[in-house]
Amino acid sequence: MSTQKNARATAGEVEGSDALRMDADRAEQCVDALNADLANVYVLYHQLKKHHWNVEGAEFRDLHLFLGEAAETAEEVADELAERVQALGGVPHASPETLQAEASVDVEDEDVYDIRTSLANDMAIYGDIIEATREHTELAENLGDHATAHMLREGLIELEDDAHHIEHYLEDDTLVTQGALE
């Protein structure tokens, strides 16, 4: 536990940024949106890691690798979100408790499910995050924060790409023969 008595920045407070010419009111709106995205992406990250660790079956290797890479992508997106929150004069959500409490996406429980169910759950979270990111991109643009909007668009491209891959994995076409399924 930290022995520091005086916090340099208080969670929930937004100063804005003179360097970025972003006043506290506009910055606070962006920070709130970015912190919500940060919480959601970290939930996604942990769920992807869970599925990466527990995947089994005929497509194990491909799915194991994909889920690991998708988790890395989610972590990179989360890092960009947190860095931008800080640049705008806010404090990024960091504790597991805060991240889970602030997430608007449903967290999968601790049980292990078949990979089709797991991927469907992942795709649902991706969909929720994609919708929120689009809304927050528009918010940032409307507030004149074009850099945040650009950063969100870049993350959105990565997240949409992984969601699209999951959609392909969930298709009915397979190389596994019917006999192997029985």
Swiss-Prot record:
EC number: 1.16.-.-
PTM statement from Swiss-Prot or TrEMBL: The N-terminus is blocked.
Record-listed Fe cation 1 binding positions: 52, 79, 83
Gene Ontology process terms (BP): intracellular iron ion homeostasis
Cellular location(s): Cytoplasm
Site residues (Involved in iron translocation), renumbered to this chain: 53, 56, 85-86, 164, 168, 171
Residues given in the record as Fe cation 2 binding sites: 83
UniProt xrefs under InterPro entries: DNA_prot_starvation, DPS_DNA-bd, Ferritin-like, Ferritin-like_SF, Ferritin_DPS_dom
Catalytic activity: 2 Fe(2+) + H2O2 + 2 H(+) = 2 Fe(3+) + 2 H2O
One Gene Ontology MF term: oxidoreductase activity
Principal subcellular localization: cytoplasm
Key word Oxidoreductase present: yes
GO cellular component terms, semicolon-separated: cytoplasm
Listed NCBIfam families: DNAstvprot_Halo
Protein family according to the UniProt entry: Belongs to the Dps family.
Further information: The dps dodecamer comprises iron-binding sites for iron translocation, oxidation and nucleation. Fe(2+) atoms are initially bound to the outer surface in proximity to the iron entry pore from which they are translocated toward the inter-subunit ferroxidase centers via two discrete steps. Iron oxidation proceeds by transient formation of tri-iron ferroxidase centers and Fe(3+) atoms move to two distinct iron nucleation centers where iron mineralization occurs.
Function of the molecule: Protects DNA from oxidative damage by sequestering intracellular Fe(2+) ion and storing it in the form of Fe(3+) oxyhydroxide mineral. One hydrogen peroxide oxidizes two Fe(2+) ions, which prevents hydroxyl radical production by the Fenton reaction.
Name recorded for this polypeptide: DNA protection during starvation protein
Organism name: Halobacterium salinarum (strain ATCC 700922 / JCM 11081 / NRC-1)
